[in-house]
């Protein structure tokens, strides 16, 4: 058995939810010098660029979770002001992107998966995105872990979808069928200038928590059923966010999937699989 096949076999065999929750408790622990030492080791191992952090000193962070969700310095990620430009919502790397064809998204070469399954199984939630565009962006452990709005939007719905917690690195994307539609995830649907925009925050092994700025921690605890929440898009209780504003965060890296409808915006020609993304830089252009 090759090393890659062994790694995939271990992904299926290990108790991923249990491991992730244990890691989550450890990441939340405030252990003083021990926490600082482990953060320093993490920075060295993953080559984290702390010069961009608002607080570059590892001793500033009382827990791993504070370090994982560290804010950046003011001005570290300028947001493109052009109203016709949709920006990258995260630091990371594009895994796949392109057209949504027959309700399917590309996971990796030779592997497609269902948009309807990704969004929680509701056909009505899926219909607005058929024939549209999608992009999958992977956040590595070294990356900035907050997720921001790629365009102005007003929240209309949030969906929690229970699932597994496979790793979401390129190896598993190439070898685990329906990876993003089988992992635990949080779906946020926004009303925007280009129509509905879906932002799917996908959980993974040792991703201890997925949070949104309006609901706080959505997971853990892990559930066994799909839950959805509808939000008003008008009036004083509407949750409206500007392009570049934070909408959520991962406690450790994972994956974000974006989707929008047909003929609304075109992904820029220089955006390709493996393209490194930086929050605030151009990703797509709204059609005239």
Swiss-Prot record:
Keywords: Cell membrane, Decarboxylase, Lipid biosynthesis, Lipid metabolism, Lyase, Membrane, Phospholipid biosynthesis, Phospholipid metabolism, Pyruvate, Zymogen. Pathway: Phospholipid metabolism; phosphatidylethanolamine biosynthesis; phosphatidylethanolamine from CDP-diacylglycerol: step 2/2. It is found in: Cell membrane. The record marks 253-254 as: Cleavage (non-hydrolytic). It catalyses: a 1,2-diacyl-sn-glycero-3-phospho-L-serine + H(+) = a 1,2-diacyl-sn-glycero-3-phosphoethanolamine + CO2. Binds 1 pyruvoyl group covalently per subunit. The keyword Membrane applies. It is an enzyme of class 4 (lyase). Heterodimer of a large membrane-associated beta subunit and a small pyruvoyl-containing alpha subunit. PANTHER family: PHOSPHATIDYLSERINE DECARBOXYLASE, PHOSPHATIDYLSERINE DECARBOXYLASE PROENZYME, MITOCHONDRIAL. Catalyzes the formation of phosphatidylethanolamine (PtdEtn) from phosphatidylserine (PtdSer). This is Phosphatidylserine decarboxylase proenzyme. It comes from Pseudoalteromonas translucida (strain TAC 125). The lineage of its organism: Bacteria, Pseudomonadati, Pseudomonadota, Gammaproteobacteria, Alteromonadales. The gene is psd.
